Amino acid sequence: MQKATSNKSILRILSLALVLLILVGMLSVGVSAESASPLKGTSVTLGSELVVNFYAEVMDTQGAAMTFCIDNDTKTIPVTQARLVEDNLYVFSCAIAPAQMTKNIEATLVDSGNTYQTSTSVRAYAEKLFASKQWDKLAAGDMMVATLNYGAAAQECFGYNTENLANAGYEKAATAEIPQAEASQMVSGSVSGISFYGASLVFETRIAVRFYFTVKGNIEDYNFSIGETPVAKDNMYYVEVPDINPQDYAENITLTVNDKMTVTYSPMQYISRMYNKTENTQLKALIGELYQYHLTAVDFLADPYGNDKDNLVSAQ
């Protein structure tokens, strides 16, 4: 029989989750803790994807699994693909689209013949944290509100679940002015048969940059230094570079083709250009909140606890 993780140890691990996730380049805004069942708590990770993490004590470390259901879509994560935190405490992660922040995630853990269920949404998670009356004093509170504002803007832009906005009831800060991009994409060098066409920012279920190329001949003749497998679209190919964290939108991304042609681009260039160009008010609002989300993430990483770090506790 495996050693059970003590409640004290669990709370210590959960209270440290914020710092641990920051160290690997992602953001977390705290962990809500439970104690009565093997389902021990939840946290939210803000990286290139918005992820809700479910913490569970697992006895069958080979056969247990957790199933997530949201919007009638289901996904099962075996414990062998979950992240081990300590002893038999595992984290099962569910990525959602920003517009889904008010949709409940139904989580079902099957372990050693027993079934355990829980549910939460990013909005419900935020309410639980703020109910502690301390998180709203921390930089983590600002990060959570910026996240809800981003989610609400995505709902309105895509016409999704707009009767239940993520930021309903929360005071919305004025969106910071987005500066003009300092430079357009930069290209140096050349490779015969391939030309850079342009770049865009994808902000649907995850944040990514797409580099578009026109190609004469076989795409397999070209090697790209970063990114995923090239995808054909509209008589072109794009190479998608994922894992763009919100604090990094102003950082340049450099892609090299066959070690001869170099393309440099940053997500902020797209944000600035689209915000100042589009006449679609809902898209403009979404891009504005995405920019505010970026600024808040930068501040949060610089000082995650704000001026009230001595009062940091897990919401219970």
Label every PLM stretch briefly.
Residues L23-S37:
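Sec-dependent signal peptide cleavage junction
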Residues K8-L23:
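Sec-dependent N-terminal signal peptides
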Residues L18, L27-V29, E220:
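Generic detector of short, well-ordered, non-transmembrane alpha-helical segments enriched
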